[in-house]
């Protein structure tokens, strides 16, 4: 039997870096990636036969857990009728109708009137800004520092010395970067200045509904609503990236969860801490992007929003978008099965599991005297090695990130698979039972001690890898 190390060495002979997405290489934590052979429920097993409780969950899609029988049956039954047609199917229509009806808040607002399926989250975000530019007749886009919207050129931009960004990846031209303006997250003052500095030039603001790629950093109370108000007052569209949060933090995603608070008690907070019920208003983004849960574990993406904007897409409008496997029957079958099974009991269970784990993590670090904060949105959460919870990218990357490697490998050796970067979110599923929770909890004391004993390294920027 070949080991994980041997397979990784072999992979590097044929695959750049040995992986097909950078974070999988364990560059941020060191060591050898685990090559997985099978998965069931809350557990994955590597090629050496070691079983792990899985807190990666394929980076979020698997809210029901791995290999849910009804999802598997849906995919197999569909595959028997054909893997792909390159033609319309009824499954596409059913999925679009389900999404348009499910993205709904407590006030009954349904902002997704049309849905276009693509194959990835990157495609969905790329298409959304193309739509925004056509609809507004403007070129500039605004993104927040630390937010991830895929690997299309307009998004691989870091904050420069001013507000105009510069490429964060090789191969991205400066001519592209000049059209992306990067501003600090949770900072309305800079955003307000931006609209003064670039009047009638900004097509859209694209924002992760709740950032989950620099750790989980919920928006300040009312921030999303004020961003929407500000953008709309200047004629810019608001694009809500719910690639991670969509159908994960609740059946209607983060937008529905947050705006529903306006009609609930003040204590019904989306994240840690209390908020006033006036902090949230029923703001409505113009466009949404989805992926992950929408495909039930298979490749998919989607753009949804107001009909007058969405109808600009070809063939009904001038904005070109196409894809050979867009709306493919296997992904739509898996997505439909997943979303139809994801009732309130599923989300309530995931929330209970997440809350139990968060409490245990906080207690373990507190008892050991190791600085750590945990932030969450629904069942989505992440840790930060800092005494104060980060509010933006600068604070997130100023944490004692070097402690995570020791923590990660201790948990791994105890049979718990975590994201191999401190900047990634942790994902539970409805398949988590008492046994899975117990294994995670039992692994924490040793892992926290390992983190606490990590040799100090100079604080500095260690960029997230995706």
Curated annotation (Swiss-Prot):
One of its GO terms (cellular component) is cytoplasm. Pathway: Porphyrin-containing compound metabolism; protoporphyrin-IX biosynthesis; 5-aminolevulinate from L-glutamyl-tRNA(Glu): step 2/2. The modification N6-(pyridoxal phosphate)lysine is found at residue 292. GO terms for molecular function: glutamate-1-semialdehyde 2,1-aminomutase activity; pyridoxal phosphate binding; transaminase activity. It catalyses: (S)-4-amino-5-oxopentanoate = 5-aminolevulinate. Keywords: Cytoplasm, Isomerase, Porphyrin biosynthesis, Pyridoxal phosphate. It is found in: Cytoplasm. Its cofactor is pyridoxal 5'-phosphate. InterPro entries: 4pyrrol_synth_GluAld_NH2Trfase, Aminotrans_3, PyrdxlP-dep_Trfase, PyrdxlP-dep_Trfase_major, PyrdxlP-dep_Trfase_small. Belongs to the class-III pyridoxal-phosphate-dependent aminotransferase family. HemL subfamily. Homodimer. PANTHER family: GLUTAMATE-1-SEMIALDEHYDE 2,1-AMINOMUTASE, GLUTAMATE-1-SEMIALDEHYDE 2,1-AMINOMUTASE 1, CHLOROPLASTIC-RELATED. This is Glutamate-1-semialdehyde 2,1-aminomutase. It comes from Tropheryma whipplei (strain Twist) (Whipple's bacillus). The lineage of its organism: Bacteria, Bacillati, Actinomycetota, Actinomycetes, Micrococcales. The gene is hemL.
